[in-house]
Amino acid sequence: MKKYIKMYLVLLIAIILFITILVIFLISGLFYPEQNPLLPISPPKKKCKTDTDCKDKGHHCVGGFCTNMSCVEAAKYDIKDIKIDPNIRSCNYTPKFYKFSNTTADLQSPFGKSRIDYGWIYSPHSNEDSCQSFCANYPEGCIAWEYDQFSGTTTGECFLYTNPHPVLKYKNGATVMAIPRKVL
């Protein structure tokens, strides 16, 4: 009988110890929540809402954190399911867009098939700004815009895209493609 009492006592102590450890893990999980995942390439230095919040030279606001990652890598991080041709290297941050030069949509993709030929632009102002404005005011929702300048002229053609999964490919020429950045 003493043998069984001793065995039950050891079992009871083990159960109490297990429950105590479980409670400690549960409590620590409540007071120390999981941190946001780190941005690839460089660790976040501080939180931000716009690029002006990032005072370090060459840093931009991506995913709510200041980082020095390249524009192409930032676009891949920021835009869900984006596919970018590895030959595309010319990308610039603008306050509201990732702006790619020598780039067009893959017209075989669902993104490319959503292309709307908005027409020729003969603006005395920046034709890219005009195309961007058309995209911003497009009633069905515009995901990206593309401006293709005719060789040797100040005239060009504006295209709008409505599919939310961009597929970009390299195109040698005076083509500019812009995709909105996530603004917090």
Swiss-Prot record:
The keyword Transmembrane applies. The chain crosses the membrane at residues 7-27. Residues 1-6 are intravirion. It is a single-pass membrane protein. Residues 28-184 are virion surface. GO terms for cellular component: host cell plasma membrane; membrane; virion membrane. It is found in: Virion membrane; Host cell membrane. Keywords: Early protein, Host cell membrane, Host membrane, Membrane, Transmembrane, Transmembrane helix, Virion. Induction: Early structural protein. It comes from the Viruses. Belongs to the asfivirus envelope protein p22 family. This is Envelope protein 169.
